[in-house]
């Protein structure tokens, strides 16, 4: 074992590290004096290294000659063999000369050169062999490179152009494939670059050889001459000069890193992308490390200050041996994952340290994690962007090549298949094997022989390569899937012949392309599709073929007319359109073509009768969704078949089924999204059995009525239900297992009548008067039950009051009740039942809540499978309670603000001048106004909590005084579409079913009873609502909201009437919003930074106590570790509270010996997984010899080599930890100083200069000097008086705390000054509406994904289970994209312009909201598995989703562990009429507003897409599946291609070319929907009322989803939209808003008019 030393004899240390020593990389020989023994050892070592270099020169030369031979045989020979074919494809002789230049001359030179090398080094290289003269002999011949290098750029440009021609691209790929190279390893560009890379590599190799060749070696002078000669050769060629400079820069950098391990930089990287200093947390240590990001590699090092051991030197200088850094670790970026860390996080990987500006790096090869922290948010962003760019560059290139290669192989496979099926060839036939017949197969050796015969290949190796490529890409397979492709008598079969082929050609995406084109063509204001006359006949809704080609070229969809014609043929072949007289295939001519979908809508179809595959309505349903958890033995109910319907036969008393509200005789429509009412009864029983065996909760859709009559026994002694509220009174809670529950009474039902008399406008007491128990016993009448409540809030409130009464010693009865409540089943049901037989009945007429209106449709898909669609609208549950909680959070936030401001006012009572008086007066008025707002919010919250009916907010008809409902979303409904169909066995894909004329079979059910065929279930969810708006009357005099709001000093407010006309984006100046946000952010940052700083102090004190108390050895550490693991990492209470409790945050620093390096990446066994050599260096020795150094501590008093005084006896690892902690503390102090010195603080002082504070800005800034003095005191303490270190630290922290408090006070005043109280009220109302709708939409999509029903990737045949898991992982990693689509008309409707200006501001504020998840311990509410809690302030609101244990366990581990999700909100808006020619003066401004909104949103969506793309390109994040390349192409490349295409279209809509604005129409609406749907967004569609426009848009989007993902025939798209629009559940929304006027704009494009009722007979 060789220990590292600081320097090398002869000054060659740097060089040592630059090239790996095969025995001990980076290790230097211990210099034990200048004796002869040491010199001999050194000489032996140099010769050993020389042998390594000789081997490398010979090995790489052989590889290089192999590459040149491959280029010659695979490309040049092949092109010459097929001259005519090549020329036809575009590879003329001239093009070939440009591409390959004189590469054959280079090959001839290198054949001779290799022979000369092998002759010199025969038989095997030895260290005494001489090589220099070989290079000198060939130096003139290397001039052959001049021609090649000067031509290289031209060759690359030509190759880019040729690659645009599909036939050339396919031909070049096939050359590579037949040559035996895996097409995706290196592109042709890479091979063409290899001669330049090789000639540049020679000087580097010779330099290394010269370094290892001792002066006495006979080869020494020749090697030196050869090095100079090769440098001269390279410097004479410009291209190689540039390449050399790059390589030398990498080599130079590597030479500065001591102890380098693994392959050299110049071997695997081409450029340095980013470098910088970061804090790294791993294995309990915080260290400062220098990081270098290259393409393919991340390296991190420790910075060297100076030679270890020298006490006097204090300046940071280079080490004697020239190195600046000490190697610490490397990770190949192929195996590296990066995860963002929210500021303020403290978890296992950060070892309890609070992370700011940080991210995690995961080495998946070794499953090792560490955390990196940058000094600023900007620097962090720079690093994350660079890492994403590096990954994109690497993966995108590979994916593109894989796609091209796949397409080429698929086409070749199809061509060969048709040739082999020819009767003359007769290769594919039934063959005998032993006693059986193997149908439709061919033999490997016959196949290769035939390929040779027809000239497809020139040698047998090429045939084997082609066969293997066909096999790997899923075109052929061995008949029993046992063998790879062999040139032997082995049987293979084309997958076309046994139905296992999955088509993945570009045309496979024709369905989504066709739907997209149809929507875009029909969204134009100037239609291309219209009625046209020809020969005295009018053809309806047609377009000439040539016009379509022109349009496709103008829009950029196709590059050439040929490509456009191919797309047109694809559309005709796949059932989108046809020639009007069925006479011609699609051509670039003036013949008319029509979309089938238009025929179906306009009745021009020759076949008007309904066909079997048309979209048909099956049944209308009104139902309620029940959630039933499994019990010990069953679900608590039985079913039976009655009149071909599945009905409930019996329900157990007190069971969870009864609690959910299940009643005997009710029809069941669906169980866990399976439409059981369409199945045979035996299969329904099987479904229930399967669900129970896997202990899954049941989601039942059960028939119900809007109003029901319930008969309840009137018992004289107890009440088994509770009633609250008035007008109408409602059921607050029902006792579990009681008669009322058995009769069907459920919490939340509104009571309309009692015994026939109307009680709708009465209160709860009037209803209860009808019951004996209440009349006789009043409040004591409640029985001892486990109560099931209406909402979680009710359950919590009841529990709290119960606990309060239990604590009261006089409440004996309450205690008994509590005990009974915890027991179960709580009630002896026997005697009660006999009682109630004779007892009189009370009849209640109740209004049911949470009803779901649904419609079931069916159609036969393109694959011939019968599909069912259940479409429902649902009112979002709990939206009133959620609004109330948001208002309570706002009120609490305001209360703290008012309290702080009043405290501050009280501090400074002296009023000196008039400006002081005015400022004070303004502040008092504002505080009073905020106080009134708090009271209002509290009152509204109480109103909303008790509100039950109606369970949603209707569109208001006219303005009204402000009330609680103004904070709830209007007409908010969640539109669910559940699609189910049998999973088909893999069959020939769409494009091939047409080519081969095979009919896919209808998949029937398994004849065996109890065995179910697998089904596919998918749920799609879109919310419709009225755009959030402010429709309140101006505040009247004396009204609480009206006071103090009209003073001119309040900024933008200019009287209420003026404000009513405009929205927030106009009223709130961007600058005002930004400065207010900046004040609030700074205030919060200071708070957080101060808490964190105190945590570091606690950690340092803890560390010092372990150092200075040697008596408490291992046991102390062990208890510490235990305590640390049991405490939460970040306490919820403030630092002051924590110190009051006498507790401190403990962080365990106990680290196993072998982990004391940088997180194990750096120790011998964890080096880069692709290292070419093993490290034997003693990791602990090397670590303790050169200790951690910090730029913060690298001052005169404290260098990295300084040690604490000996009498403290601190072990070196503890010193390292102390350095790390102090480093972190000083980092925090620096960041606090930076915040307090920043421009925001200066602005706050400027704004509040009229308020008499104790100090001016100058005095305030001088306080920083105290902190600087405090720091130098700490450094002196470390050096001279370590016992006093805790006191020095305490002094520093006290100074900082005072400094921060002064800053926060100033910010409070500035905030008060710039707050506009009236606008804040409006902002709150609109924000609340948007947030509540967003939360309800996300929660519906989340539950679908947790139940494995979410799937936005159905068109790629991905299962809902995989897609759901992927989406959950995606949102955990990248956040939630919220897509809001607005169909408002700002140019023509003044109110809608105001709405648009309001929501633009508000939706951007949603980006500050975070979602997190907790587990629900116990649930006393039926049929809900999620409820919400709100924390935080307006600027950082946190929504906590409480999920039941079943769903919580399915969350990604990151979310289970408490990580939060961020919202990314995008608003796309488009008016549904052409405003270009409108005379209205505001139309241009409205158009500009839409343009700005869309541009900003597109940028956000593209940013999200970049993050998502990076996430999916991480191989390890994809579902682990050992399938072939083909599946990966399907589920990764095709979706990415589609997203790229959609982004391109969106850019053309948002930034149209000059003069092309009219040609894009309203296409932005369907395209933005598809883009966001594919990105996994939660979707919300809004218009003025949430009725006409938004509901039609949803119907269109749902029909498009069915066509893209679920095989709806293209001709049925508009038919489906029309039926869903006019007969679907959304007609209920119109029924609920009868007097509200809303209609489609007059000039709406054709797509939105086709489904409207005809006006005057015109469609």
UniProtKB/Swiss-Prot annotation:
Sequence ranges assigned to domain DEP in this UniProt record: 421-496, 523-597
InterPro entries noted in UniProt: DBL_dom_sf (IPR035899), DEP_dom (IPR000591), DH_dom (IPR000219), GDS_CDC24_CS (IPR001331), mTOR-Rac_regulators (IPR051832), PDZ (IPR001478), PDZ_sf (IPR036034), PH-like_dom_sf (IPR011993)
Disulfide bonds: none
Gene Ontology terms: biological process: actin filament polymerization; G protein-coupled receptor signaling pathway; intracellular signal transduction; negative regulation of TOR signaling; neutrophil activation; neutrophil chemotaxis; positive regulation of cell migration; positive regulation of substrate adhesion-dependent cell spreading
Cellular compartment(s): Cytoplasm, Cytosol; Cell membrane
Function comment: Functions as a RAC guanine nucleotide exchange factor (GEF), which activates the Rac proteins by exchanging bound GDP for free GTP. Its activity is synergistically activated by phosphatidylinositol 3,4,5-trisphosphate and the beta gamma subunits of heterotrimeric G protein. May function downstream of heterotrimeric G proteins in neutrophils.
Protein name as annotated: Phosphatidylinositol 3,4,5-trisphosphate-dependent Rac exchanger 1 protein
Organism per entry: Homo sapiens (Human)
Record gene name: PREX1
């Amino acid at each position: 074992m060789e220990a590292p030393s600081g320097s090398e004899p002869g000054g060659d240390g740097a060089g040592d590290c630059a090239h790996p020593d095969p025995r001990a990389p980076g290790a230097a020989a211990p210099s034990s004096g200048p004796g002869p023994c040491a010199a001999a050892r050194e000489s032996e070592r140099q010769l050993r290294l020389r042998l390594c270099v000789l081997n490398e020169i010979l090995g790489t030369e052989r590889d290089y000659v192999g590459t040149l031979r491959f280029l010659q045989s695979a490309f040049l020979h092949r092109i010459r063999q097929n001259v005519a074919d090549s020329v036809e494809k575009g590879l003329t002789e001239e093009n070939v000369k440009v591409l390959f230049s004189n590469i054959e001359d280079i090959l001839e030179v290198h054949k001779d050169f290799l022979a000369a090398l092998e002759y010199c080094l025969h038989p095997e290289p030895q260290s005494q062999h001489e090589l220099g003269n070989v290079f000198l002999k060939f130096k003139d011949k290397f001039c052959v490179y001049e021609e090649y290098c000067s031509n290289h750029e031209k060759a690359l440009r030509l190759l880019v152009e040729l690659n645009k021609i599909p036939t050339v691209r396919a031909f070049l790929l096939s050359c590579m494939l037949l040559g035996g190279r895996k097409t995706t390893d290196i592109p042709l560009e890479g091979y063409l670059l290899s001669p330049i890379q090789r000639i540049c590599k020679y000087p580097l190799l010779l330099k290394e050889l010269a370094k290892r060749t001792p002066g006495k070696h006979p080869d020494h002078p020749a090697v030196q001459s050869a090095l100079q000669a090769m440098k001269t050769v390279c410097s004479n060629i410009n291209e190689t000069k540039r390449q050399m400079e790059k390589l030398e820069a990498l080599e130079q950098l590597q030479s500065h890193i001591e102890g380098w391990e693994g392959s050299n930089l110049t071997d695997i990287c081409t450029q340095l992308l980013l470098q910088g200093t970061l804090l790294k947390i791993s294995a309990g240590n915080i260290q400062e490390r220098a990081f270098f990001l290259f393409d393919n590699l991340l390296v991190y090092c420790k910075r060297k200050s100076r030679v270890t051991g020298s006490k006097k030197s204090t300046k940071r200088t280079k080490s004697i041996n020239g190195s600046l850094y000490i190697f610490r670790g490397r990770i190949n970026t192929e195996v590296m994952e990066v995860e963002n860390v929210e500021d303020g996080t403290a978890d296992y990987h950060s070892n309890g340290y609070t992370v700011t500006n940080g991210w995690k790096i995961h080495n998946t090869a070794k499953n090792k994690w560490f955390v990196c922290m940058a000094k600023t948010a900007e620097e962090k962003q720079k690093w994350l962007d660079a890492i994403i760019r590096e990954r994109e560059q690497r993966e995108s290139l590979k994916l593109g090549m894989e796609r091209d290669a796949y397409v080429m192989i698929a086409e070749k496979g199809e061509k060969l298949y048709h040739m082999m099926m020819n009767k003359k060839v007769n290769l594919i036939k039934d063959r005998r094997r032993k006693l059986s017949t193997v149908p439709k197969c061919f033999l490997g050796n016959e196949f290769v022989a035939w390929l040779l015969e027809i000239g497809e290949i020139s040698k047998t190796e090429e045939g084997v390569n082609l066969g293997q490529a066909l096999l790997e890409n899923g075109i052929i397979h061995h008949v029993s899937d046992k063998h790879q492709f062999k040139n032997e008598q082995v049987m293979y079969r084309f997958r076309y012949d046994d139905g296992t082929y999955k088509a993945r050609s570009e045309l496979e995406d024709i369905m989504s392309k066709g739907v997209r084109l149809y929507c875009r063509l029909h969204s134009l204001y100037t239609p291309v599709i219209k009625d046209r006359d020809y020969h005295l006949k009018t053809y309806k809704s047609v377009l000439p073929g040539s016009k379509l080609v022109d349009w496709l070229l103008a829009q950029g969809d196709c590059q050439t007319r040929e490509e456009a014609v191919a797309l047109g043929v694809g559309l005709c072949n796949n059932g989108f359109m046809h020639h009007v007289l069925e006479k011609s295939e699609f051509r670039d001519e003036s013949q008319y073509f029509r979309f089938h979908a238009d025929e179906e809508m306009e009745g021009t179809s020759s076949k008007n009768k309904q066909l079997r595959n048309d979209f048909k309505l099956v049944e209308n349903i009104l139902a309620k969704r029940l959630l039933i958890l499994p019990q010990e033995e069953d679900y608590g109910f039985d079913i039976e078949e009655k009149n071909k319907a599945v009905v409930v036969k019996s329900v157990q008393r007190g069971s969870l089924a009864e609690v959910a509200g299940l009643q005997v005789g009710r029809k069941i429509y669906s169980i866990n999204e399976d439409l059981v009412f369409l199945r045979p009864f035996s299969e329904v029983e099987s479904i229930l059995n399967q669900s129970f065996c896997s202990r899954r909760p049941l989601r039942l859709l059960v028939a119900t009525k809007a109003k029901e009559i319930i008969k309840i026994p009137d018992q004289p002694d107890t009440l088994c239900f509770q009633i609250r509220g008035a007008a109408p009174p409602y059921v607050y809670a029902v006792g579990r297992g009681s008669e009322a529950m058995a009769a069907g009474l459920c919490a939340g039902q509104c009571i309309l009548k009692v015994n026939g008399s109307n009680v709708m406008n009465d209160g709860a007491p009037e209803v209860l008067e009808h019951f004996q128990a209440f009349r006789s016993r009043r409040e004591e009448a409640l029985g001892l039950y486990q109560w099931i409540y209406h909402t979680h809030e009710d359950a919590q409130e009841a529990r709290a009051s119960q606990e309060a009464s239990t604590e009261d010693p006089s409440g004996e009865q309450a205690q008994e009740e509590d005990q009974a409540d915890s027991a179960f089943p709580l009630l002896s049901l026997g005697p009660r039942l006999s009682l109630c037989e004779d007892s009189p009945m009370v009849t209640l007429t109740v209004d049911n809540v949470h009803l779901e209106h649904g419609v079931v449709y069916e159609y036969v898909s393109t694959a011939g499978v019968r599909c069912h669609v259940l479409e429902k609208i649902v009112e979002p549950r709990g939206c009133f309670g959620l609004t109330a909680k948001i208002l309570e959070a706002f009120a609490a936030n305001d209360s703290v603000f008012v309290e702080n401001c009043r405290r501050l006012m009280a501090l400074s009572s002296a009023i000196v001048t008039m400006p002081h008086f005015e400022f004070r007066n303004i502040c008092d008025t504002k505080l009073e106004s905020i106080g009134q707002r708090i009271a209002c919010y509290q009152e509204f919250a109480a109103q909303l909590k008790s509100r039950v009916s109606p369970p949603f907010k209707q569109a208001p008809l006219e303005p009204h005084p402000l009330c609680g409902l103004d904070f709830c979303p209007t007409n908010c409904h969640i539109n669910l579409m559940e699609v189910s169909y049998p999973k088909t066995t893999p069959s020939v894909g769409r494009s091939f079913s047409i080519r081969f004329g095979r009919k896919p079979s209808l998949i029937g059910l398994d004849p065996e009873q109890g065995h179910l065929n697998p089904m596919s279930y998918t749920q799609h969810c879109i919310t419709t609502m009225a755009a959030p708006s402010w429709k309140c009357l101006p505040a009247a005099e004396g009204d609480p909201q009206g006071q103090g709001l009209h003073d001119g000093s309040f900024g933008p407010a200019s009287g209420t009437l003026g404000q009513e006309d405009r929205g927030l984006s106009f009223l709130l100046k961007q600058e005002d919003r930004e400065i207010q946000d900046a004040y609030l952010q700074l205030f919060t940052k200071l708070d957080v930074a101060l808490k964190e700083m105190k945590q570091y102090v606690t950690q340092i004190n803890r560390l010092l106590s372990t150092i200075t108390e040697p008596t408490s050895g291992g046991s102390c550490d062990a208890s510490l570790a235990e305590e640390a693991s049991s405490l939460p990492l970040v306490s919820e209470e403030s630092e002051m509270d924590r110190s009051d409790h006498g507790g401190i945050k403990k962080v365990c620093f106990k680290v196993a010996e072998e982990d004391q390096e940088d997180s194990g990446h750096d120790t011998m066994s964890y080096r880069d997984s692709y290292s070419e050599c093993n490290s034997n260096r003693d990791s602990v020795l090397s670590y303790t010899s050169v200790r951690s150094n910090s730029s913060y501590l690298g001052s005169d008093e404290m260098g990295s080599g300084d040690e604490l005084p000996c009498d403290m006896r601190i072990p070196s690892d503890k010193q390292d930890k102390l350095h790390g902690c102090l480093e972190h503390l000083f980092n925090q102090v620096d960041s606090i100083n930076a915040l307090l010195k920043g421009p925001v603080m200066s602005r706050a002082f400027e704004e509040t200069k009229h308020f008499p504070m104790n100090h001016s800005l100058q005095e305030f800034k001088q306080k920083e000097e105290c902190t600087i003095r405090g720091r130098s005191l700490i450094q002196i303490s470390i050096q001279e008086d370590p016992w006093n270190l805790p006191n020095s630290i305490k002094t520093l922290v006290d100074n900082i705390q005072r400094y921060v408090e002064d800053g926060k006070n100033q910010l409070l005043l500035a905030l008060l000054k710039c707050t506009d109280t009236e606008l804040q009220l409006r902002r709150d109302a609109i924000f609340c509406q948007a947030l509540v709708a967003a939360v309800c939409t996300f929660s519906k999509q989340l539950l679908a994904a947790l139940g494995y029903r979410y799937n936005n990737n159905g068109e790629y045949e991905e299962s809902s289970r995989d897609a759901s898991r992927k989406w959950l992982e995606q949102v955990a990693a990248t956040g939630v994209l919220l897509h809001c689509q607005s169909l408002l008309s700002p140019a023509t409707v003044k109110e809608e312009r105001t709405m648009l200006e309001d929501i633009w501001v508000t939706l951007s504020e949603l980006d500050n909201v975070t979602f997190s998840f907790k587990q629900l311990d116990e649930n006393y509410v039926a049929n809900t598995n999620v409820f919400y809690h709100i924390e935080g302030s307006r600027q950082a609101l946190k929504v906590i989703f409480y999920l039941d244990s079943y769903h919580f366990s399915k969350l990604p581990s990151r979310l289970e562990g408490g990580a939060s999700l961020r919202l990314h909100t995008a608003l796309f808006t488009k008016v549904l009429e052409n405003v270009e020619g409108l005379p209205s003066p505001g139309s241009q401004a409205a158009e500009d507003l839409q343009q700005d909104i869309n541009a900003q949103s597109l940028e956000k969506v593209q940013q999200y897409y970049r993050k998502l793309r990076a996430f999916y390109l991480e191989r390890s994040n994809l579902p682990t599946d050992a399938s072939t390349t083909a599946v990966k192409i399907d589920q990764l490349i095709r979706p990415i291609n589609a997203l790229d295409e959609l982004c391109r279209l969106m850019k053309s809509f948002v930034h149209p070319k000059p003069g092309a604005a009219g040609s894009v129409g309203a296409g932005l609406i369907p395209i933005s929907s598809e883009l966001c749907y594919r990105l996994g967004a939660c979707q919300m569609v809004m218009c003025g009322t949430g009725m006409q426009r938004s509901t039609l848009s949803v119907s269109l989007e749902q029909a498009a989803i069915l066509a893209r993902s679920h095989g709806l025939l293209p001709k049925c798209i508009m038919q489906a939209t029309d039926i869903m629009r006019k007969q679907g559940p959304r007609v209920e929304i119109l029924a609920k808003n009868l007097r509200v006027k809303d209609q489609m704009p007059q000039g709406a494009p054709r797509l939105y008019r086709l489904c409207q009722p005809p006006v005057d007979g015109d469609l």
